[in-house]
């Protein structure tokens, strides 16, 4: 399990992991109210990337990362559906 200290390193590695095999990759968000920490984990069952934070400003970064991944998912699906219908 690779735990990253900086958001930039984590987001690059997580996007690369997703693009390597989109069908196996999954993202998990976990919030612990008791200590106010947020943990995001991206895994494909072989590699596990983790980023933990307790900073409120990182929530915006995580939200932006999620929307970026969703765009990648939708773009990939729309291309494959278009190829199937042709």
From Swiss-Prot:
Primary localisation category: cytoplasm
Keywords of this entry: Cytoplasm, Ribonucleoprotein, RNA-binding, Signal recognition particle
Biological process according to GO: negative regulation of translational elongation; SRP-dependent cotranslational protein targeting to membrane
Keyword RNA-binding tagged: yes
Pfam family, one: SRP9-21
GO molecular function ontology, one term from the record: 7S RNA binding
Cellular component GO terms, alphabetical: cytosol; signal recognition particle, endoplasmic reticulum targeting
Localization (cell): Cytoplasm
InterPro entries in the cross-refs: Signal_recog_particle_SRP9/14 (IPR009018), SRP9 (IPR008832), SRP9-like (IPR039914), SRP9_dom (IPR039432)
Domain of life: Eukaryota
Known partners and oligomeric status: Heterodimer with SRP14; binds RNA as heterodimer. Component of a signal recognition particle complex that consists of a 7SL RNA molecule of 300 nucleotides and six protein subunits: SRP72, SRP68, SRP54, SRP19, SRP14 and SRP9.
Family: Belongs to the SRP9 family.
Record function comment: Component of the signal recognition particle (SRP) complex, a ribonucleoprotein complex that mediates the cotranslational targeting of secretory and membrane proteins to the endoplasmic reticulum (ER). SRP9 together with SRP14 and the Alu portion of the SRP RNA, constitutes the elongation arrest domain of SRP. The complex of SRP9 and SRP14 is required for SRP RNA binding.
Protein name, UniProt field: Signal recognition particle 9 kDa protein
Gene source species: Canis lupus familiaris (Dog)
């Amino acid at each position: 399990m690779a735990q990253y200290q900086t958001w930039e390193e984590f987001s690059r590695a997580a996007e690369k992991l997703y693009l390597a095999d989109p069908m196996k990759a999954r993202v998990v968000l976990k919030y612990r109210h008791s200590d106010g920490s947020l943990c995001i984990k991206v895994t494909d069952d072989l590699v596990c990337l983790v980023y933990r934070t307790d900073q409120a400003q990182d929530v915006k970064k995580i939200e932006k990362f999620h929307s970026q991944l969703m765009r990648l998912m939708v773009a990939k699906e729309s291309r494959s559906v278009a190829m199937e219908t042709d």
